[in-house]
Amino acid sequence: MQFVNSGISVTDLRKTFGNSEIIKGVTLDIEDGDYVSLTGKSGSGKSTLLYMISSLDPPSSGTIKIDKKDIYRMNEEEIHEFRNKRMGFIFQFHYLLPEFTAIENVLMPARKAGLLKEYQSYAEHLLEEFDLKDRMNYRINRLSGGQAQRVAIARALVMNPKYIFADEPTGALDSTNTKVVMNILEKVNRETKTTILVVTHDPDFASKTKRQIHLVDGRVVSLKEFEAIKKSVKTAR
């Protein structure tokens, strides 16, 4: 599938809950093929920003354009089609359907698009790539946490999306499975040029990405300012 070469553009994005402004005028650009991490302490607004950029939560104000399209000006049918064809999502919890097998879960996006047969072999290929060939027909409750998360990643990739949005994808995993997931995402970006935006509190994970965006109290800050703030917090302790 051919996509417009334009990436993600965020302008003066704000999010308010009650009287509290959580995201404070964020402006940023993410180029096609980039691999970007959103870092910052808990409560800094990382996940909120990711959800807005990925069309899952509307901003209070500001604009988000993906491939030159203002995603919050689309109607429900348009945004559903846009997500299904161009976006893949990975979360801390896998949200797989326990009554279905690994391969059936991977194929859910294709089933929704009416393209089950067209993507069957590719779904099998992904599970083989993720060392799950002998687990394809296992139900989710027979898989380990790391195996289930790999199934979730395969599900996110099965429609060949241009963009992957991942919210703490290793947050519930042990160190061994964390490295597996990190390596998978790095390989996907390198080999397919899929644009990846990932939220992580893990500095080792962030260091594997091509670029880090640092959030402090809902604002994007420079690396120098980010390090200075971290240092001042440690000193205060």
Curated annotation (Swiss-Prot):
Keywords: ATP-binding, Cell inner membrane, Cell membrane, Membrane, Nucleotide-binding, Translocase, Transport. It is found in: Cell inner membrane. GO terms for cellular component: plasma membrane. SMART domains: AAA. It is a peripheral membrane protein. Its main location: membrane. Gene3D superfamilies: P-loop containing nucleotide triphosphate hydrolases. InterPro entries: AAA+_ATPase (IPR003593), ABC_transporter-like_ATP-bd (IPR003439), ABC_transporter-like_CS (IPR017871), MacB-like_ATP-bd (IPR017911), P-loop_NTPase (IPR027417). It is an enzyme of class 7 (translocase). Residues 8-236 form the ABC transporter domain. Signal peptide: none annotated. One of its GO terms (biological process) is transmembrane transport. ATP binds at residues 40-47. GO terms for molecular function: ATP binding; ATP hydrolysis activity; transmembrane transporter activity. Part of the ABC transporter complex LolCDE involved in the translocation of mature outer membrane-directed lipoproteins, from the inner membrane to the periplasmic chaperone, LolA. Responsible for the formation of the LolA-lipoprotein complex in an ATP-dependent manner. Belongs to the ABC transporter superfamily. Lipoprotein translocase (TC 3.A.1.125) family. The complex is composed of two ATP-binding proteins (LolD) and two transmembrane proteins (LolC and LolE). PANTHER family: ALPHA-D-RIBOSE 1-METHYLPHOSPHONATE 5-TRIPHOSPHATE SYNTHASE SUBUNIT PHNL, LIPOPROTEIN-RELEASING SYSTEM ATP-BINDING PROTEIN LOLD. This is Lipoprotein-releasing system ATP-binding protein LolD. It comes from Leptospira interrogans serogroup Icterohaemorrhagiae serovar Lai (strain 56601).
